[in-house]
Design a protein with these regions (language model features):
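Conserved ABC transporter NBD signature motif
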Residues: 81-89
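The feature captures the beta-strand-to-loop junction immediately N-terminal to the Walker
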Residues: 58-60
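Conserved structural motif at the start of ABC-family nucleotide-binding domains
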Residues: 27, 42-44
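Helix-to-loop junction immediately C-terminal to a conserved catalytic motif
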Residues: 73
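Catalytic Walker B motif of ABC-type/P-loop ATPase nucleotide-binding domains
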Residues: 182-186
Length: 285
């Protein structure tokens, strides 16, 4: 159940994002376990994500980040445990009902051959077909493409785009869906610095308007810069959850990633840097 009363407000950009009090629980996972055969991928995971916050899932390869995101989205049924979305169990909800409450950006894009970029973004509006919200389809698509910096690619066939351009088109499609929970799996992996910042700035803006945002990131400095809380996963367990300053300590990061790391502050930013030997010392050895 949601732990706080909710109130209705209206997004200044798309009109629907901020329909919940920012501190109300959007997603709640309890005792989530996922096993594939004999292999346990997630073990006893508990996590709450609130409206109005960005939560970053970080951890080494194979830690269970993408699996947890899929469980939170309702795309993967856990072996045991429960996930609630705005107080309702995710399990058993119809796909359209889920799609009107949460949007998912998957790690591997499978955009259909032959579609133009704008057509792909318009697919995000399909869940609102034959509803009053459909009247704003063009407006919302225009906004999403501008925010994702893909307006100039509108008429390009998607397979002709670079990997980063395709990733931004997919992000625009997520924005066009215009829902209150955003689940992003490594949205910055194919992007240059400018567009990494742009995507996460928009994720932050969505949260500031009341959305709940969960984002899988490998870059810990990006996670520290843009998230309210960080959940550190390791071997299927959540090792720590808290503010970036609380959990991204050199001790924990070095242990989880099995590599010594520095964590320091620079002009108000928390930076995580792997410890490297100098080239001269490598040559001497």
């Amino acid at each position: 159940m949601m732990t706080e009363e909710t109130t209705t407000s209206t997004s200044t950009v798309t009109g629907t994002v901020a329909a919940q009090t920012p501190r109300a629980v959007a997603l709640s996972a309890r005792g989530v376990e996922v096993r594939f055969g004999e292999r346990t991928v997630l073990a006893g995971v508990d996590l709450d994500v609130r409206h109005g916050e960005v939560v970053a899932l970080v951890g080494p390869n194979g830690a269970g980040k993408s699996t947890l995101l899929s469980v939170l989205a309702g795309d993967l049924e856990p072996t045991s445990g429960v996930v609630d979305l705005d107080g309702l169990p995710v399990a058993g909800q119809k796909p359209v009902a889920l799609a009107r409450r949460r949007a998912v950006l998957v790690q591997k894009q499978t955009l259909a051959f032959g579609f133009r970029a704008r057509e792909v973004v318009e697919m995000g509006r399909s869940v609102w077909h034959r509803t009053p919200k459909a009247e704003r389809d063009d407006e919302v698509v225009d906004w999403a493409m501008e925010v994702a910096d893909v307006t100039h690619l509108s008429d390009r066939v998607v397979p002709t785009l670079s990997g980063g351009e395709q990733a931004r088109v997919a992000f625009a499609r997520l924005l066009a869906q215009d829902v209150e929970v955003h689940l992003l799996d490594e949205p910055t992996a194919a992007l240059d610095i400018k567009h990494q910042e742009g995507v996460l700035r928009q994720a932050r803006a969505s949260a500031d308007r009341g959305a709940a945002v969960v984002v899988v990131l490998h870059d810990l400095s990006l996670a520290a810069a843009w998230s309210d809380r960080v959940a550190v996963l390791s071997q299927g367990h959540i090792r720590a959850v808290g503010t970036p300053q609380e959990v991204l300590t050199p001790e924990l990061v070095s242990e989880v990633y099995e590599h010594p790391c520095h964590v320091f502050h620079h002009e108000g930013n928390l930076l995580v840097v792997p410890l490297r030997s100098s080239r001269s010392s490598q040559e001497e050895s």
